[in-house]
Amino acid sequence: MSTSGTLTSYYVDSLILPENEELSVPRYSAGPGHQHSRQPASIGDPHSELGTCSFPSKPPVFGPSWSHVPAQFPGTVSSVYHHHYGHHQGPVGTETDGRYQSWLLEPMSGSLPMAGLPTTHHYGIKPDGLGVRSGGALPGSHTALLLSDYANGTVATAPPVEKDAVSSHTGDGVDTEEKPGLDPSKSAVYITFYLYRTYSGDRDNPVSNWLHASATRKKRCPYTKHQILELEKEFLFNTYLTRDRRYEVARLLNLTERQVKIWFQNRRMKMKKFNKDGAPKDD
């Protein structure tokens, strides 16, 4: 029961012990028979101290900026976390706390390696990076990445002046000539002239119809003399044809029913006009 009480008291003290007392008092007991100096003489309940503990505020370990990030991480984790049962540790000096001795408090190197960038280029802080950045354009095609920009949550980008300087620097010695594009109006005229010269001699070609602006009206097909004679005979007997008779006449004269119908309509209009004007007078 005493061993369990000792371990429980150690866990509680490691959480609530202030820094000044924690630095001057050893963490582990000298032996299994001795008790901790802060442990009361009589222990009734191992968990009795949990109800009255208070957690004092400590300054934050991580600063506002990332200026203490080293270039290489430690090989093992034993320097950050210490096992409770492995060995006994003496009092720690007043400069640093033993629980927070880690690579975070080591001085940083001169450059910050970028994991996503190729290894051939080195993006680091240059000695004259600040002066060149405030004065004018940065030399070269790459911009130095400053840690202050990463601390503020932004990434340094070259201003428009720097971009113009970089483009002018890369364009030295190379003559850039702008090729004039084709004028749409000239292109249309050229195509029209080419088509006109190609199809102007062939009027039967359907491609050249739009060039010659030929009429879309169907060519007139006059009736033959035999057809007109037979139609005139039929008109003398009947000025109006029935559907059956119109079909027979069209079949005999090798015409369509629509052609026969139109001819009879025109013939009736001509007769009507002739009757209206009267017969011509003989001198």
From Swiss-Prot:
It comes from the Eukaryota. GO terms for biological process: anterior/posterior pattern specification; DNA-templated transcription; embryonic skeletal system morphogenesis; proximal/distal pattern formation. GO terms for molecular function: DNA-binding transcription factor activity, RNA polymerase II-specific; RNA polymerase II cis-regulatory region sequence-specific DNA binding. Residues 25-54, 162-181 are annotated as: Disordered. Keywords: Developmental protein, DNA-binding, Homeobox, Nucleus, Transcription, Transcription regulation. GO terms for cellular component: nucleus. Residues 216-275 bind DNA. It is found in: Nucleus. InterPro entries: Abd-B_homeobox_TF, HD, HD_metazoa, Homeobox_CS, Homeodomain-like_sf, Hox9_activation_N, HXA9/HXB9/HXC9. Its main location: nucleus. Sequence-specific transcription factor which is part of a developmental regulatory system that provides cells with specific positional identities on the anterior-posterior axis. Belongs to the Abd-B homeobox family. This is Homeobox protein Hox-A9a.
